[in-house]
Amino acid sequence: MTTETLSLIKSSIKSIPDYPKKGILFRDVTSLLEDAQAYQATIQLLVEKYKDMGFTKVVGTEARGFLFGAPLALELGVGFVPVRKPGKLPRQTVAQSYELEYGTDTLEIHVDAIKPGDKVLVVDDLLATGGTIEATTKLIRQLGGEVEHAAFVINLPEIGGDKRLEGLGLQVYSICEFEGH
């Protein structure tokens, strides 16, 4: 990745102070999507990183993980599997709950979306605490999939999600990092 490409991607991500609550500096990846050159560069970096690793599925988490996971899956020539909030998937699902700052949330995946032995790459827009990807990883493994890699556009390393996911045996890759929360 050239410094020019990294600069293009990083500068396209807007920072919104005090959103969704006071004291948070929100990294808005939707501004990257508005810039076709930055969006394409992001997908191409992910393709270059993962093109020869033998993945059979790409899993993206709701909702912004879909925006990076689906085009990556197309470029890699593999299927894309969405992981969604409860009640959003039409076929039979399995669910995994996980802890939030205040309470819990749940994610679901179709029971037939991952086959035993599938080699899965998990993709999301941003890594903060790692809770969403930990739950996603548990779902994939419950269905017999092999998941050892997780890719993100943005990592907020001070929050520690990368360490949490490494503790699950995942190799974590992010295109860019930002300080703070």
Swiss-Prot record:
Its main location: cytoplasm. Keywords: Cytoplasm, Glycosyltransferase, Purine salvage, Transferase. GO terms for biological process: adenine salvage; AMP salvage; purine ribonucleoside salvage. One of its GO terms (molecular function) is adenine binding. It is an enzyme of class 2 (transferase). Disulfide bonds: none annotated. Belongs to the purine/pyrimidine phosphoribosyltransferase family. Homodimer. This is Adenine phosphoribosyltransferase. It comes from Vibrio cholerae serotype O1 (strain ATCC 39315 / El Tor Inaba N16961). The gene is apt.
